[in-house]
Structure formats: C-alpha cells, structure tokens
C-alpha cells in the first residue's frame, strides 16, 4: 500500500494551510469547482465536512452550511462519490491535494464503520477527523483505519492536560488538531490581545509535549492570523471565514471564483 498524501505532506519541511469546506455549499454543484479552485490557489490539505444535523462542535456558520448541504442532498455516500469524481478528474481537473474528512460518529455508525473505511479509501480519502470519538475509546477504529492506510486526527483543546496532549499526539497518525480556543468553530476572537497571548502560551505548551506535528484552527480569518499561527504550529485551518465569503454565491461558478479569490488572500 502506497503512503497516503497526508503522510507525504507532513514529511516536508514546510508550514501548511488547510481549507475546510462543506460540500455543495451554498448551491448544488459547487463542490468539484470549489475543490479545483482551492487546489489551483495553493491549498495544502482539503478538509471536507460530512454534514450532520446536530454538529455539537460547530458554530453557526458551519451549522448553517451543514443544513444547506443536507438540503442539497449530501449524504456520506454522495460525498464519497464526489471525492471519487474529484480524484478521477470527472467534472473538474484531477484533484491531487490530500483530502481529510471531518464528521461525527453517528452517521459513520449508521453507514457501517468497516464499510465506511473501505469506501473512503476507494474514493481517494486520505484521513479522518471524528471530533466526538474519544482517543481512549478509539483503539479498534485506529487499528482498522491503519489497515486501510488512512490517517486519523485527534483534537487538543486549551484545557487538555499535558499527559493527555501526549496521548493524543501518540495516537494521531501524522498530526493532531489544536482548537485555538474553547467553544465552537468560527466564534473565536483571535484579534483580541489577551486571547492571542493565551493562545500563544497554549500552543507553546502543546509544542513541549507533542513529538508529531500539529495544526491549529477555530477563528482564523486572514493572512496575518495564519502567519501568526505558523510561528507556533505546523499548519493553520481556515473554514468559517471561507464559508462566509462564498455564502451569497448563486452559482457553482461564482462559488469557485470567490473561493479562489479568498484563498489567494491567505497566501
């Protein structure tokens, strides 16, 4: 089995930038054009949301995007077919960037865990982030994901104690994901001086206890914040700001144009 794209990327001596996108948002047919636009605009990893009706870790922007995606017909099966088409270059240029899926346990259980891992690999997925899967209870899932060559990412928060940072670091396949602040996605106010200082101290603490790379997300909105986070972390994730920028799009073409326009401001 060949090494997956995420593993290949994290071996490089570079800081990386991850885009979070909710499929078929804001209009049906947007996904493949947006993936092409992001890749051509220099994205390093594409994180695709698996829409869920009760996304406990997501703020209003991503919740609204998830509800839109569900209304537009996005299921896990539909999403995996979009990934397959992206990898094959059907409906867009062939997408080669690593693809990470982010979603919650219940839909995966309903789909069938083993079937999901098999189908995700076959479609061209590289990794998985399941926010409500506790690392302490993930041994079976981790073993199976490893068997399929899929990267698994676990979350660290500002209140995670040092010994648990070390556990999460050891269990995350290639990198862990640090929540910049406690709360939900898109609600962080990283421009606040006190918040920024607290985040810096927290990321320094993670660096002391992590042997692998880690990325940081929640509330990152612009190039200045991306570059600031790169001082402490190996990667930055931008999601809610991207979704807000494209939210008023009326066509897939406009969505892709705006996605590219926004992403280029981060580089």
Curated annotation (Swiss-Prot):
Record-linked SUPFAM superfamilies: Ribulose-phoshate binding barrel
Statement: the UniProt record of this protein carries the keyword Repeat: no
Catalytic reaction(s) noted: (1S,2R)-1-C-(indol-3-yl)glycerol 3-phosphate + L-serine = D-glyceraldehyde 3-phosphate + L-tryptophan + H2O
Enzyme Commission number(s) of this protein: 4.2.1.20
Assembly and oligomerization: Tetramer of two alpha and two beta chains.
Function: The alpha subunit is responsible for the aldol cleavage of indoleglycerol phosphate to indole and glyceraldehyde 3-phosphate.
PROSITE patterns, sorted: TRP_SYNTHASE_ALPHA
Native source species: Pelodictyon phaeoclathratiforme (strain DSM 5477 / BU-1)
Xref: Gene3D superfamilies: Aldolase class I
Pathway annotation from the record: Amino-acid biosynthesis; L-tryptophan biosynthesis; L-tryptophan from chorismate: step 5/5
One GO CC term on file: cytosol
Ranges in a coiled coil: none
Protein name: Tryptophan synthase alpha chain
Residue numbers annotated as active site: 47 (proton acceptor), 58 (proton acceptor)
Keywords: Amino-acid biosynthesis, Aromatic amino acid biosynthesis, Lyase, Tryptophan biosynthesis
GO-annotated molecular function: tryptophan synthase activity
Keyword Protein transport attached: no
Family from the record: Belongs to the TrpA family.
């Amino acid at each position: 089995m060949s090494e997956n794209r995420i593993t290949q990327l994290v071996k490089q001596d570079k800081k990386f930038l991850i885009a979070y996108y909710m499929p078929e948002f804001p209009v049906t047919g947007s996904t493949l054009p947006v993936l092409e636009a992001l890749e051509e605009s220099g994205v390093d990893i594409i994180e695709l949301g698996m829409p869920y009706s009760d996304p406990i870790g997501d703020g209003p922007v991503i919740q609204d995007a998830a509800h839109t995606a569900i209304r537009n017909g996005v299921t896990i099966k539909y999403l995996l077919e979009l990934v397959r088409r992206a990898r094959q270059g059907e409906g867009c240029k062939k997408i080669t960037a690593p693809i990470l899926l982010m979603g919650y346990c219940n839909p995966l259980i309903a789909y069938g865990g083993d079937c999901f891992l098999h189908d995700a690999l076959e479609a061209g997925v590289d990794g998985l982030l399941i926010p409500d899967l506790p690392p302490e209870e993930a041994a079976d899932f981790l073993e199976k994901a490893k068997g399929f060559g899929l990267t698994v990412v676990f979350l660290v928060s500002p209140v995670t104690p040092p010994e648990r940072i070390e556990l999460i670091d050891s269990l995350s396949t290639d990198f862990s994901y640090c929540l910049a602040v406690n709360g939900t996605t898109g609600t962080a106010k990283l421009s606040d001086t006190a918040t920024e200082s607290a985040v810096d101290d927290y990321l320094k603490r993670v660096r002391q206890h992590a042997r692998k790379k880690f990325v940081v997300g929640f509330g990152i909105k612009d190039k200045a914040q991306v570059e600031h986070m790169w001082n402490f972390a190996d990667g930055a994730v931008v999601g809610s700001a991207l979704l807000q920028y494209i939210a008023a799009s009326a066509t897939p073409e406009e969505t892709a144009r705006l996605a590219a326009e926004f992403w280029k401001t981060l580089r």
